[in-house]
Amino acid sequence: MRPVRIIGAQGSHAGSINSTFHCTDVKVNGAWVRESEDDSGIILRYWDGHWRVQRRQDIEADPTMSMARLAAPDARPPLLLKKASEWQVYCHKDKTWIFKH
């Protein structure tokens, strides 16, 4: 699978999010997880039919709640993220979104 390039992210994590993600040997819901080549702490992860950019440390700390940004229904480069204020915390337990700025 080819690498995916993410562009257009803003905010404090933009430097690590705007990078190239390469495929790993990990699968989530039948889709490959992609890790950032610039920052191994950021991954592009498939969940509920969508790709999300997430911080690995958040997932490891609490798998039910993690920093997530809906990227696209299909990870075809380039993915364009919107402004940082649209980043959200998604709680998998009750399928709700909590907005964080």
Language-model segments: residues:
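Interface elements of modular peptide-recognition networks comprising either
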Residues: 1-101
